[in-house]
Regions:
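Extracytoplasmic ligand-binding site segments that recognize negatively charged/polar headgroups
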Residues: 95, 103-105, 109, 120-131, ...
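Bacterial Sec-exported substrate-binding components of ABC uptake systems
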Residues: 22-105, 216-243, 367-378
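Proline-aspartate-enriched helix->loop->beta-strand connector
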Residues: 152-168, 184, 294, 298-304
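Flexible, glycine-rich surface segments
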Residues: 237-314
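Structured C-terminal subdomain patch of bacterial secreted/periplasmic proteins
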Residues: 194-219, 303-378
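N-terminal export signals
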Residues: 7-25
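A short, structured surface patch at a secondary-structure boundary
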Residues: 59-156, 162-168
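Soluble non-cytosolic domains of exported or imported proteins
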Residues: 146-150, 166-173, 194-201, 215-218, ...
Length: 378
């Protein structure tokens, strides 16, 4: 069968592995098997990873930004010799995980995989997910140090099978290197580089593949897509929205226009007031604005959403204005249309549909109540 160029490029990782396996087969032990490419795992939104599936149930996960590759083998699969350098083998079941990336915890909870995690890079008080905090308080998950200062002795004593980091670890590459020297595989997940909320949630398929729970991952993801889809079919509301916090040094921290929060505001039917702020090349999703610039851009916004994650929640208008006196002149403050995110917002990474639905209700209802992520600032 003649392959198109696209099919060839998609199959290339499989071809490379197969050739490597064939080259080694002459001297390989009897339990060595070649990997035969079967199909590319379908992804609808995520761009930061790919998955190539092979006969027998093995899957090659590739992080597109870094090029790192992980070959996930079923528990009873034969060893594969002659793999290209840099391919890390993960044999199922993957257990005793050291989880540093907080945004991954919610995906594990939706996969009913909390028991796969033994160690956390966040202390119990830092979790805004009840199940994670309870597991730590009960001793089922232990604190093993943050990303830059892990407790290597504890990690080794726990027979850690995998460390899951986010890209913060790139600031301390020696930590990743040390974990790998100890024989601990490290996945630096890149969901934060996805600009679409649906792409971020689709990372549940990455973990579903790794844990052998692909079907559940697909079901959970599809449910979230179906919850958002009706809103995407509605006309825009014509209203504007700002998402921000005031920093301790009197700057306004806002999301860039290409960020996933800005996209969720658009999905809900509003126009994000700082949509013209673009990525300056530092890969950060936020930027700090002088208060005068924030005032000019957000003064007439119909809705203000205060991000509680860094500076804490605000409950009253007085608390908000105490952070920045200029806010008293804002239209949304004067009309009583200011909301504050719950502190679990960024940790509940599989519930982004709830934020879109919440904001749509804020935009279209007079006094919405029972919202998941938004609380009124009164």
């Amino acid at each position: 069968m003649k392959l198109t160029r696209q099919q060839f490029l998609k199959a290339f990782p499989a071809s490379a592995l197969l050739l490597a396996g064939c080259a080694a087969r002459q001297t390989a032990p009897a339990n060595t098997e070649a990997l035969v490419f079967d199909h590319a795992y379908p992804l609808d939104y995520a761009q930061q990873f790919t998955a190539d599936c092979y006969e027998g149930g093995s899957t090659l996960l590739t992080l597109t930004g870094s090029g790192e590759q992980f070959l996930v083998l079923p528990e009873d699969a034969a060893e594969v010799d002659g793999l290209p350098a840099g391919v890390t083998v993960l044999r199922q079941p993957v257990q005793d995980i050291y989880l540093v990336s907080t945004s991954v915890m919610d995906l594990f909870l939706h996969l009913d995989a909390l028991d796969c995690i033994t160690l956390s890079g966040t202390q119990a008080a830092g979790w805004h997910l009840d199940e994670a905090r309870a597991a730590m308080e009960a001793g089922r998950i232990a604190y093993a140090g943050k990303y830059s200062a892990p407790d290597y002795e504890q990690i080794l004593a726990s027979n850690c099978g995998l460390a899951i980091e986010n890209t913060m670890i790139l600031h301390t590459p020696e930590v990743k290197e040390q974990l790998e020297r100890f024989g601990i595989p490290v996945v630096v997940e890149r969901s934060s580089y996805e600009s679409s909320p649906l792409a971020r949630m689709e990372w549940i398929k990455f973990w579903g593949i790794l844990l052998g729970r692909e079907t559940l991952a697909e079901q959970v993801f599809q449910k979230q897509v179906e919850r958002i889809q009706p809103l995407l079919e509605q006309a825009p509301t014509g209203k504007t929205c700002a998402f921000f916090s005031i920093t301790a040094n009197n700057l306004a921290n806002v999301r860039k226009g290409g960020d996933y929060v800005a996209q969720m505001i658009g999905m809900a039917g509003a126009d994000y007031v700082f949509s013209d702020l673009t990525d300056s090349g530092n890969n950060l999703s936020t930027m700090n604005l002088p208060l005068e610039d924030f005032y000019a851009g957000a003064k007439d916004a119909d809705v203000l959403i205060y991000n509680s994650t860094i500076e804490g929640m605000v409950a009253t208008t007085d608390e908000l204005v105490a952070k920045c006196a200029l806010l008293a002149d804002f239209r949304a403050v004067q009309s009583g249309n200011v909301w504050c995110t719950t502190q679990s917002f960024f940790q509940q990474s599989m519930e982004l549909a709830d934020f879109v639905i919440d904001l749509h209700r804020v935009l279209t209802e007079d006094a919405p109540d029972g919202l998941h992520f938004l609380t009124p600032v009164t």
